[in-house]
Amino acid sequence: MIRYSAIVQGRVQGVGFRYFIQLTACKLSLTGWCKNLMNGNVEIEVQGLENNVLSFVSEIKKGNGFAKVSDIDLNILPVLDGEKKFSIKY
């Protein structure tokens, strides 16, 4: 198990990107959350099997066809026990 925080930069708000993030995380059996930041970026915390998290990051970099990701800043975090789902925070 591994957990990352990520700040995603680019055209990532107002284009269905958080929903795309949530769907991608659920398909890969990952937990965590994502939310829009006031500066136009999206913040993500994601946790799961390392290969699945790496696949998630790869998919997020590609975007959903409407979003345009210019950069992702990743940092490793301690794993959270008991987290059961991936949610969108508002």
UniProtKB/Swiss-Prot annotation:
It holds the Pfam family Acylphosphatase. Its EC number is 3.6.1.7. It is an enzyme of class 3 (hydrolase). InterPro entries: Acylphosphatase, Acylphosphatase-like_dom, Acylphosphatase-like_dom_sf, Acylphosphatase_CS. The active site is at 18, 36. It catalyses: an acyl phosphate + H2O = a carboxylate + phosphate + H(+). Residues 3-90 form the Acylphosphatase-like domain. One of its GO terms (molecular function) is acylphosphatase activity. Keywords: Hydrolase. Belongs to the acylphosphatase family. This is Acylphosphatase.
